[in-house]
A protein has these predicted regions:
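Periplasm-facing N-terminal accessory domains of Gram-negative outer-membrane beta-barrel systems
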Residues: 37-126, 183
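Outer-membrane beta-barrel proteins, especially TonB-dependent receptors
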Residues: 122, 127-153, 172-180, 184-185, ...
Length: 792
């Protein structure tokens, strides 16, 4: 039966005049496909649902076909039947409270059989480990990057890969540095979990990209908004979770090789993976993975950008063992990159800097006529090592005990241009981190509730000068040496029925940070200052299944974040950002109160999801450009002239909407629309905030062919001009809005996957408001990439 979708009274989306007709025209086309007739839909699909552990039949399991109205519930014998299905390729989903959901792809021609074996749901709402698919059991707004969409973006940085998910954008420093922005928040307010461990680097910097090789993980999920109390209350923006596939448990050796070429920058990427078990040693598994990347100067629509190459050399090793009662795994990775910083962002005097900002095109000295692969100064040279051990033990009372310990070393060198033959223009950051977690996971607190409790600890030492944290030698570093300790305690309880789920969690953190700065350069007298912060975070999430087609969820949460060392103590030139940054040691901790609501509705061939959120942050800390009476303020140093940015504290309100709607025109043709809108307001000073993402709209279409998993897809990305900026609050006006056309295609031939992607196909010249180098140059022009992957 086809269900009609009616416009709800009172709903109105206000658009600027120059884009109203474009949106209306698209929506008319989009919704007109709803009347397509169905024919020849005679197929039947049946199967059984049981538990994986003891093979018991599971009644009441929800089984549905994604993108259709075909859904049912397993009967008392665990059997399900779906009838009147059109022939074609579908994604079949089975879910049940307290079990991990399962997705599988089926090719249906007449009558099909598909059985499911469900595993106990060991992870909880707010700390779901990524499985590369839609996580049904979460009360947080979330997005996933998986399957074909993930494959299309292989070879890109993590920040660039996530850009395009609803509610997620990218903060850039030129074309080579990118980091995720979730609902307008980024850096220290976004936790990145790599292999289940908090990634600890110099993530406070807008130009400090995550030190992660995305090839190390096949599954990526973004939880939007405060959540994941297990991992820290400071995730006011959200969490990016990366997890690999489980280690193999058979002795057979498998692997893959991926070769990718990007035309823009003439960048080559080579990544390989090899995994297997140990012969005659049941339970053991291992994996080795590595990536190489090499690229030169990036090209805009009209010119090359000097010194914008990138190089990467990454490797990771994993070893694990599992039995019926316990399991353990070891993991080690090394990430190394050298990133060129656009030379036009480091200028020697005020007049040249102001001229560079005002020109529509960079000075000729910074736009070479030919492609250059060599990376010169200024640049970033970054090394990141991560070693982790994790153990799991199943207790007799059906509870479990988990322990994780990790060591990380992050070494960052930022080299400025040489001036007057002196080699003093260098920043060094060396961050060593030891962290751990002990978790007691109660499978059943009683017949109705289940929960978990545990504590986390973190110990860090940050060195910018001298051999040790306690023995600094220089007073001229951007940051002083400092040590940091953080201890957190958390508890989460969850109850689930067939119709609804409820989760309540609380966390308490105490953080101590102590600085070490010499009285003068190379002075034996060390001045120490100590700051202690503590705060409570908590959340309540409720999810309700209205029927087989509709579910809604609401979350109310409070998050606490202590100031970071950069926000408290910065005072100097930040080479990578091309800015002079000044901190404030009197800053207080942030507290955020967030309310989010989302609904997922799947009538007929539709899949519609809308999320609303409102995040009020007291004592919000942000980096603001110094402007007095409309005139920019600059710092003149021996390193050159740089715009001044200061850390300030206000009360802020972030509100927005994420919308994603797709329609299955036929089993082979799908269209989709995505919308991301965020509004940020300084309620203390009654004005808009700077550096907030502009409205973003995406229109996509995909057609899949019958053979070899071949497909073609295309889309238009529209980013509006950011008009909600106070006059005179920045060094230049926000750039104009823009449209980008992107094309994709792929095919599988035996063990080979071949795909082509064209980004910015029309070679548009544009500048993005979230690119800190928009003052100086255009963004990247057309980029054609080709990937060949071999799996064995």
């Amino acid at each position: 039966m086809t269900k009609n979708i009616r416009e709800k009274d009172g709903f109105r989306l206000s658009l600027s005049p120059n884009c109203q007709m474009k949106h209306v025209f698209f929506l008319l086309i989009f919704f007109s496909f709803n009347g397509f007739a169905q024919s020849n839909c005679h197929c039947t699909l049946k199967g059984f649902v049981s538990t994986k552990e003891n093979k018991e039949k599971v009644p009441g399991a929800y089984v549905y076909i994604k993108g259709t109205n075909k859904a049912t519930v397993s009967d008392s014998k665990g059997q399900f039947i779906l009838k009147d299905i059109c022939p074609g390729k579908y994604t079949l989903v089975c879910q049940m409270a307290s079990f991990d959901p399962i997705e599988t792809v089926i090719n249906l021609e007449d009558e099909g059989q598909e059985d499911f074996q469900l595993s106990s749901h060991e992870e909880h709402l707010q700390e779901v480990f990524v499985q590369g698919r839609k996580q049904e059991n979460t009360s947080q707004l979330n997005s996933q990057l998986n399957g074909e969409e993930r494959s299309q973006k292989d070879g890109l940085s993590l920040g660039e890969m996530l850009k395009g998910l609803t509610g997620v954008q990218s903060l850039q420093t030129g074309s080579t540095v990118s980091k995720p922005v979730i609902h307008g928040l980024h850096s220290s307010r976004v936790i990145i979990l790599n292999q289940g461990v908090r990634q600890e680097g110099q993530n406070w910097g807008s130009e400090h990209a995550p030190e992660i090789d995305p090839f190390v993980s096949k599954n990526i999920q973004v939880i939007k908004g405060p959540g994941g109390l297990r991992y820290g209350g400071d995730a006011i923006g959200g969490i990016v979770m990366l997890e690999p596939n489980a280690l193999p448990d058979s002795s057979a050796i498998h692997g893959s090789i991926q070769s990718i070429y990007f035309s823009n920058g003439r960048q080559g990427v080579l990544s390989g993976l090899l995994e297997g078990g140990i012969p005659r040693q049941n339970g053991w598994g291992w994996r080795i993975q590595g990536t190489l990347k090499d690229g030169g100067n990036v090209q805009t629509a009209n010119y090359y950008l000097s010194n914008t190459g990138v190089k990467e050399e990454n490797v990771s090793i994993a070893l694990g063992y599992k039995s019926n009662r316990w399991a353990a795994d070891l993991f080690y990775s090394r990430f190394h990159t050298v990133i060129g910083i656009y030379e036009g962002s480091h200028i020697g005097n005020i007049s040249d800097l102001e001229r560079s900002i005002s020109l529509p095109r960079p000075l000729p000295a910074f736009t070479p006529l030919e492609f250059i692969r060599k990376i010169d100064r200024p640049n970033q040279d970054v090394w990141h090592d991560l070693a982790k051990i994790k153990a799991y033990y199943k207790l007799p009372n059906r509870a479990s005990l988990r322990a994780t310990a990790a060591i990380q070393s992050d070494e960052r060198w930022e080299l400025d241009v040489l001036r007057a033959g002196k080699n003093i223009n260098t920043l060094r950051f060396n961050l060593d981190t030891q962290s751990g977690e002990i978790l007691y996971d109660e499978i059943n607190t009683n017949k109705r509730w289940k929960g978990q409790a545990g504590f986390t600890f973190l110990d860090q030492g940050n060195i910018t000068s001298g051999p040790k944290v306690q023995n600094p030698t220089l007073t001229t570093s951007l940051l002083p040496n400092y040590s940091l300790q953080n201890i957190g305690f958390f508890a989460i309880e969850r109850r689930a029925t067939e119709r609804w789920e409820l989760e309540v969690g609380v966390r308490y953190d105490i953080k101590e940070i102590e600085t070490h700065r010499p009285k003068a350069n190379f002075s034996p007298t060390i001045i120490r200052n100590r700051h202690i912060y503590s705060g409570t975070s908590g959340s309540v999430g409720f999810k309700y299944h209205w029927n087989l087609l509709t579910e809604s969820q609401v979350t109310v949460s409070r998050a606490f974040r202590a100031p970071g060392g950069n926000e408290l103590f910065s005072n100097g030139v930040h080479h990578g950002a091309g800015a002079y940054e000044i901190g404030d040691p009197n800053l207080k901790g942030e507290t955020g109160t967030n309310i989010s609501f989302s609904t997922n509705y799947k009538p007929d061939r539709w899949d519609i999801e809308i999320g609303l959120y409102s995040n009020h942050i007291h004592n919000f800390i942000y980096l603001r450009p110094e402007v007095i009476n409309g005139d920019a303020v600059y710092a003149t140093t021996v390193r050159g002239v740089f715009p001044i940015f200061t850390y300030q504290q206000i009360d802020a309100r972030f509100q927005g909407v994420d919308l994603q709607a797709s329609y299955l025109i036929s089993p082979r043709l799908t269209i989709q629309q995505k919308t991301s809108i965020v509004r940020a307001y300084d309620t203390m000073n009654d004005q808009f905030m700077v550096n907030i993402p502009a409205d973003r709209f995406e229109y996509l279409a995909r057609y899949g062919f019958k053979k070899n998993n071949a497909y073609v897809s295309g889309g238009i990305t529209q980013v509006s001009k950011q008009t909600r900026v106070e006059k005179g609050s920045d060094y230049s006006e926000p750039p104009a809005g823009y449209y980008l056309v992107n094309l994709n295609g792929g095919i599988t031939i035996k063990h080979f996957d071949i795909s082509i992607r064209v980004s910015n196909a029309l070679n548009a010249a544009y500048r993005d408001y979230l690119n800190r180098f928009r003052y100086y140059a255009d963004d990247q022009g057309r980029n054609i990439s080709m990937k060949v992957a071999y799996t064995f």
